[in-house]
């Protein structure tokens, strides 16, 4: 038990002070021995840290006695050496303030020293791993020491000597081993990877490694070799990475003429993707490089880096600003121009081997062509995506939207230009896959357009290509100077591009389905209904569309709508109603057609998991007018439901048609509940009043209401369609009249019906025969086909019908009141 807790204990400050004097004497011995060990350590950096260990205050491990035992030594009575250092009269020495633990003084290492120790530890493991031919471990050691070196550069520590020694050791290990000696595939793969990385690192640190080879002993004695930029000669650059000075793109831009071209380009490449990177300075510096580029290779390399940097600058924006977008487009034009001029010497392809050193031109292949790794069409796709995003964010009612839409032609020109380039330079085994991407983009810009608009785009595109440096050789359809882009040419373009995608069914089902839908949409819009229907039915798209991605589902829904409109234009009312019915009854028609606003799509983005919001929206100029869809659907319902309702109410047994929100039957039932009916104002009102006129047998008034609907002008050849629709209204009004008023006639004159509905006698006879056969009406034509003779049956009058309905309602309400 401690003496402090004893009742008889008396604190003696004198004895305590004597004990502390003994302790402090032993501590001074430990401190002095520890300081001698510290002085013997080597330093491997330019900036040597002053030891701060003398300022460390460690509590004594010996137990203090007295009521102030819990205080720090300097606050106790008598202090750590028998006196309080805060008293003015006290002669306090700072050496007495440090105290050690029983096992000796604890040495605190700086971050530099810890990083150095880790590098030394890895350096010591290289020999043992090499002796065992463990290249997987060697590769891990190389990756670890590279991470440490990167950390040293980030902290502005310079280049450690131990890193240079490690590089030289790795190089010796690689040189001493032959790949033929390695039988294991995994080890051989690790060896090849290590060899390539070491080769690159030695190249980057050539000056430092060379100095080490010449005088290894100096690296053990001298603290540091200066760090260089990408391990090249620092004297060639106006700045250095060594010490505490960082890379500055502004400095590069201001001293561009003093720098080596590829050194500067490497600095720009290394700065991409890093935090706090100034994209404006990157673009400015790269543009300066483009101005001083002399060889085609330098221009190509600069373009391949400048265009992605422009896209990087707008990655956090809704879309790329117009100025930068046009600059990117001009850069792409410039890149293609250089490649077209030097097509026999330089080619940019996605399938070229990787070049670790950009300053070294790739070796020429067997055809004498130097292949440069890059993806031209990826940049074209990105440019197209930024164009689409800008259209989605611009107000569709503004003049800015129309101005922006004019840039679509330049995108289309680039796509065709890329197609011609890829046809010439891409190897046969990769051509189909790459051209499929090109054709997808090309079709996206023309499949929904009318023949007139496609002709304009094709004519302008091929005219610009003929004026440029591009080759006009193509194995696909192209527009010659003597040809005209008429409807036949447009159909040939769409068919050839779509068929190319359709043929890839075994390799790429996605391309097959998109090609089928592109072709179906175009034919339904510009040609005929029957061929489009045949293409759609012959494919299996409808079976699997529910499991497809959002973009394909939207395209499929658009095709279905266009098929319905094509059937309406062909006068196939029943088929049009069947095709449109599945989509028009959907309350989210705007969303499933991709015609919602971008803001609304962002709010509902959780509906389609994993789909980019831009895929759920189409630019405004690609929309199918929803009012037109509703008008066509309700007009079809008008022509089908009104005669059907008249037949049902007249007592004829007919199959009951399902009632939907937009069906004319539901609209009529809703209108009957209204107390006051004003003149028609909306689209729905005009259809309603046309239906009521048909029920009365007034076909002229019904046609007049339909003609007042303005959306008919959106259909091609709208006058012909209205005339065709008028004839349909006449016939269906005749049917409605016969069903409604047959109970009042024993026979009706055919000639009278012909005059009443302004139809030929042959058509009236055909309608009468159709009613008798299809609806099983108890009637017949006389021998001379002059009258329709009705047989009296168990038909009820209108008054009886109302009475029966009233009885049913009374019975229903009586039972309800009893409950």
Swiss-Prot record:
It comes from the Eukaryota. Residues 1-106 are annotated as: Disordered. One of its GO terms (cellular component) is eukaryotic 43S preinitiation complex. It is found in: Cytoplasm. Keywords: Cytoplasm, Initiation factor, Protein biosynthesis. Pfam families: eIF-3c_N (PF05470), PCI (PF01399). SUPFAM superfamilies: Winged helix' DNA-binding domain (SSF46785). GO terms for biological process: formation of cytoplasmic translation initiation complex. Component of the eukaryotic translation initiation factor 3 (eIF-3) complex, which is involved in protein synthesis of a specialized repertoire of mRNAs and, together with other initiation factors, stimulates binding of mRNA and methionyl-tRNAi to the 40S ribosome. The eIF-3 complex specifically targets and initiates translation of a subset of mRNAs involved in cell proliferation. Belongs to the eIF-3 subunit C family. This is Eukaryotic translation initiation factor 3 subunit C.
